[in-house]
Amino acid sequence: MAQKKVALACTVCGSRNYTIDANPNRTDRLEVKKFCKYCGKHTLHRETR
């Protein structure tokens, strides 16, 4: 099955700053610390579906 595009949203402000290719068969949501240009700092970003 092909990879599916999902967005990574900032947990602080809620903006969707990054898109990634992810396997749709995973049950857990990806969590990564990345830079949010709206908050101006590194924050936790979670996968949205």
UniProtKB/Swiss-Prot annotation:
NCBIfam families xref list: PRK00504.1, PRK00595.1, rpmG_bact
Molecular functions per Gene Ontology: structural constituent of ribosome
A GO CC term attached to the entry: ribosome
Lineage: Bacteria, Bacillati, Bacillota, Bacilli, Lactobacillales
Name assigned to this protein: Large ribosomal subunit protein bL33
InterPro entries (UniProt xref): Ribosomal_bL33, Ribosomal_bL33_sf, Ribosomal_zn-bd
Key words of the record: Ribonucleoprotein, Ribosomal protein
Pfam families: Ribosomal_L33 (PF00471)
One GO biological process term: translation
Listed Gene3D superfamilies: Ribosomal protein L33
